[in-house]
UniProtKB/Swiss-Prot annotation:
PANTHER family tied to this protein: UPF0178 PROTEIN YAII
Name of the featured protein: UPF0178 protein YaiI
NCBIfam families associated with the record: PRK00124.1 (NF001095)
Source species taxonomy: Bacteria, Pseudomonadati, Pseudomonadota, Gammaproteobacteria, Enterobacterales
Underlying gene: yaiI
Top-rank taxon, per record: Bacteria
Family designation: Belongs to the UPF0178 family.
Amino acid sequence: MTIWVDADACPNVIKEILYRAAERMQLPLILVANQALRVPPSRFIRTLRVAAGFDVADNEIVRQCKAGDLVITADIPLAAEVLEKGAAVLNPRGERYSDATIRERLTMRDFMDTLRASGVQTGGPNTLSPRDRQHFAAELDKWWLESQRKK
């Protein structure tokens, strides 16, 4: 099992939670980004720098993740692709995507893209709240416990 992070867009506070979790769970944590990242020294934490470009980091995560891995991303198309490979997906707000929910998310994303393309300003997501951080940490722990039961 490996935790993969779409690190270019992942909030720093979520990365901090992941650093502590990787140590506690003794699991590989790989942060994939198109820029250099500073991470704490750890035998469990590493970065994977990819070339700059549209979806380069996403494509690398899809290529390398396996069933049973966890992917941290807010990118809906990336989430859909790794779900097809049998990986679990958690967004930085603590929402776990599933085969049942990802289709609805893809539809909503496409609708919002259409609105933006027609000139409608849709705004971005709200800032990450303390409640979001707690929810993320709780869902991460829940995934870990479920993974341990499956062994």
